[in-house]
Curated annotation (Swiss-Prot):
It is found in: Cytoplasm. GO terms for molecular function: argininosuccinate synthase activity; ATP binding. L-aspartate binds at T118, N122, D123. It catalyses: L-citrulline + L-aspartate + ATP = 2-(N(omega)-L-arginino)succinate + AMP + diphosphate + H(+). It comes from Oenococcus oeni (strain ATCC BAA-331 / PSU-1). L-citrulline binds at Y86, N122, R126, S174, S183, E259, Y271. One of its GO terms (cellular component) is cytoplasm. Pfam families: Arginosuc_syn_C (PF20979), Arginosuc_synth (PF00764). ATP binds at A8, Y9, S10, G11, G12, L13, D14, T15, S16, G116. The lineage of its organism: Bacteria, Bacillati, Bacillota, Bacilli, Lactobacillales. InterPro entries: Arginosuc_syn_C, Arginosuc_syn_N, Arginosuc_synth, Arginosuc_synth_CS, Arginosuc_synth_type_1_subfam, AS_cat/multimer_dom_body, Rossmann-like_a/b/a_fold. This is Argininosuccinate synthase. The keyword 4Fe-4S does not apply.
Length: 406
């Protein structure tokens, strides 16, 4: 009896030709597709396609809610933007996909897992690092990386094995998508001097085509996570879908970014993240009035490390778990509502409130007669605040010596 292998199946040509290729190696192929909110893809057709090509089983797993609640949530709470721009769209879905692949392999007594990553991308590391962590004995196959066909050779192989070639196969782009956004690379985008053409975008309108009137949305957060829009409570996945559509109409969330990949090269990427742009801007704004001074200044250090761990395939690690416990502790006070203005490609926080956790005191901040700040206390504070530097200068005369030399 042939060994079983679980294939991470997208329905595209690469993972489709992988089915007969793996069969030729003696495997019985089980295709697994995870629905994490891919825009416009007919997930049922993907399941039928895998079976038609030769998979013995094809599973479609609805992971949208789990993805939003257990994965996107961590990015929101930690304000995770890789290199200050990228909200980890593709990197974020990989740990969940891999978890389901390993679980399916165990449930079906499979001896191996196959993925469709190339030898040039980050995903090969993300897939294989997580698989090794979850099951060190699991064998891994990487057909796309191993056979290294040209496009013409791949099409010829597809025809020989009755694998349908997608009608959009001539598209130059390599696209990945989920609830949290859309990534696009390759083709004309590989030259960073080329402006991204209109067809590189799908979720967002060009700014010149956006409405001339702004939309305002009130986003309520509880423990650092969005729970409602304009007083309408929603599951997080539904909330993200809603904001993706609304913010996309206003051209919000376009990112043109040359990033440093884990494997050492620089890559030009086009991202569309409408909901992420709105939610993360609102979340950070709410933190500004609810986090204590030292926490607010220290948290970005932890955020950057968490961001890099996610991007660099270290979701499954004790450090990642420990840092997220710190983040979760900080989010207990991040409760309130932020009013966002969506207009001409920008998402701007224009008002915010927190009934029980706001550290902003209008009486302390005002310059009117309602002021309750004790300004005389500032005199003694200045003396104590500068005392270490004052004593150091008195002893060493550093700056006075510099003046004498001049």
């Amino acid at each position: 009896m042939a060994d079983k292998i679980v294939l991470a199946y997208s329905g595209g040509l690469d993972t489709s030709v992988a089915i007969p290729w793996l069969k030729d190696k003696g495997y019985e192929v089980i295709a697994v597709s995870l629905d994490v909110g891919q825009h416009g893809k007919q997930i049922e057709n993907i399941q039928k396609k895998a079976l038609k090509i030769g998979a013995i089983q094809s599973f479609i797993i609805d992971g949208k809610d789990e993805f939003a609640e257990n994965y996107v949530s961590k990015v929101i709470k930690s304000n995770a933007l890789y290199e200050g721009e990228y909200p980890l769209v593709s990197a974020l879905s990989r740990p969940l996909i891999i978890e389901k692949l390993v679980q399916t392999a165990h449930d079906n007594n499979a001896v191996a897992i196959a993925h469709g990553s190339t030898g040039k991308g980050n995903d090969q590391v993300r897939f294989e690092a997580a698989i090794h962590a979850l099951d060190p004995e699991m064998k891994i196959e990487a057909p796309i990386r191993d056979f290294q066909w040209s496009r013409e050779e791949e099409i010829e192989y597809a025809h020989q094995h009755n694998v349908p070639v997608p009608i959009n196969f001539d598209s130059p782009y390599s696209i990945d998508e989920n609830l949290w956004g859309r990534s696009n690379e390759a083709g004309i985008l590989e030259n960073p001097w080329n402006q991204a053409p209109a067809d590189a975008y799908a979720l967002t309108s060009p700014v010149e085509d956006t409405p001339d009137e702004a939309d305002f949305v009130d986003i309520e957060f509880k423990n650092g996570l969005p729970i409602s829009v304009n007083d309408q409570e929603m599951k997080m996945a539904d909330l993200i879908v809603y904001l993706n559509k609304l913010a996309g109409i206003h051209g919000i969330g376009r990112i043109d970014h040359v990033e440093n990949r884990l494997i050492g090269i620089k890559s030009r990427e086009i991202y569309e993240t409408p909901a992420a742009a709105v939610i993360m801007t609102a979340h950070k704004d709410l933190e500004d009035i609810t986090l204590e001074h030292d926490v607010a200044h220290f948290k970005p250090i932890i955020e950057q490390k968490i961001t890099n761990l996610i991007y660099n395939a270290m979701w499954i690690s004790p450090l990642f778990d420990a840092l997220n416990k710190f983040i979760d502790e900080t989010q207990k006070v991040v409760n309130g509502t932020v009013k966002m203005k969506l207009y001409k490609g920008t998402a701007t926080a224009v008002a915010r409130k927190s009934e029980n956790n706001s550290l902003y005191s209008e009486k302390l901040a005002t310059y009117t007669s309602a002021n309750s700040f004790d300004e005389q206390a500032a005199v003694g504070f200045m003396k104590l605040y500068t005392l270490p530097a004052t004593v150091y200068e008195q002893v060493n005369h550093i700056h006075s010596k510099e003046k004498e030399e001049i």
